């Protein structure tokens, strides 16, 4: 029902997706991701909270986010840093090959063409990983997920047209699963309930719709975090309206309704 009416290429709010899967089994979660892939839908992680890391992990994620903003300039990393070594290796792979021709050969089962296509595609994996840097998953893990998705896509129909979307899907999945492991879905679900309660109470007390800042103050969170909760709630309401069954009333039912 959550995916009803969605068209290939549409995005799905990852935060709302997580709240729906909070109490589901791992098997059900895998089925949900499989449904996303089958319908060619992409998770939008922009509303996922990413402030739940602490210590060295948080420092590294911030460092990698800055690295991505600076165009993956690895000069600030240790010379033995695995990420630096990997990115320097990718940078040495020459560009300029005819990817369309290679894709056609790979689709015919030619292994050398598939390997060349893979190496060329790794440049694109690095570029796309910049979009997800600092979102809860380390860059090396994002690059690994993106590389695996790239390899699985090589040789399939419309590879070049689908390449970026399958890489993004793999990285968005990794970020979403990490958020789930960190309990983001449960926290968001509770925050949604609290938001509704505070909104209704302030409406009654003030005699008007409360502002976002007033709700945030009552919930002891920043306006930015409250806005994230509000957006997830709005998405859930829109989905509920869009998927609600439309009941058709017969003449007899219409007369009863009037009475």
Name the predicted role of every residue range.
Residues 19-46, 222-239:
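Charge-enriched amphipathic alpha-helical scaffolds
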Residues 1, 183-191:
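Short alpha-helical segments that sit at the start of domains
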Residues 60-62, 79-85, 189-259:
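Charged, low-cysteine interdomain linkers and short loop/connector segments
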Residues 1-10, 197-204:
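Short amphipathic alpha-helical interface segments
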Residues 34-75, 244-250:
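Charged low-complexity interaction tracts in eukaryotic proteins
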Residues 14, 26-30, 80, 168, ...:
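Amphipathic alpha-helical transducer elements in NTP-driven molecular machines
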Residues 8-20, 210-213:
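Short acidic, hydrophobic short linear motifs in intrinsically disordered regions
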Residues 65-183, 194-201, 214:
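Alpha-helical promoter-recognition and RNA polymerase-docking modules of transcription initiation factors
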């Amino acid at each position: 029902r959550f995916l009803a009416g969605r068209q290939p290429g549409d995005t799905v709010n990852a935060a709302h997706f997580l709240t729906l899967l909070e109490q589901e089994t791992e098997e059900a979660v895998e089925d949900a991701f499989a449904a996303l892939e089958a319908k060619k839908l992409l998770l939008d992680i922009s509303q996922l909270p990413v402030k739940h890391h602490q210590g060295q992990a948080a420092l590294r994620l911030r460092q990698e986010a800055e690295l991505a903003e600076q165009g993956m300039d690895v000069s600030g990393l240790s010379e033995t840093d695995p990420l630096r070594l990997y990115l320097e290796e990718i940078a040495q792979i020459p560009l300029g090959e005819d990817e369309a021709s290679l894709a056609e050969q790979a689709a015919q089962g030619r292994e050398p063409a598939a390997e060349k296509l893979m190496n060329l595609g790794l440049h694109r994996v690095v570029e796309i990983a910049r979009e997800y840097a600092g979102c809860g998953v380390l860059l090396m893990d994002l690059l690994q997920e993106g590389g695996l998705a790239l390899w699985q896509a090589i040789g399939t129909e419309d590879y070049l047209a689908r390449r970026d979307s399958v890489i993004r899907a793999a990285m968005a999945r990794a970020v979403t699963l990490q958020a789930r492991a960190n309990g983001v879905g449960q926290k968001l679900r509770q925050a949604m309930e609290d938001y509704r309660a505070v909104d209704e109470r302030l409406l009654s007390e003030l005699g008007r719709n409360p502002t976002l800042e007033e709700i945030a103050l009552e919930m002891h969170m920043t306006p930015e975090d409250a806005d994230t909760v509000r957006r997830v709630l709005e998405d859930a309401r829109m989905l509920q309206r869009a998927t609600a069954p439309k009941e058709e009333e017969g003449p007899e039912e219409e007369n009863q309704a009037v009475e």
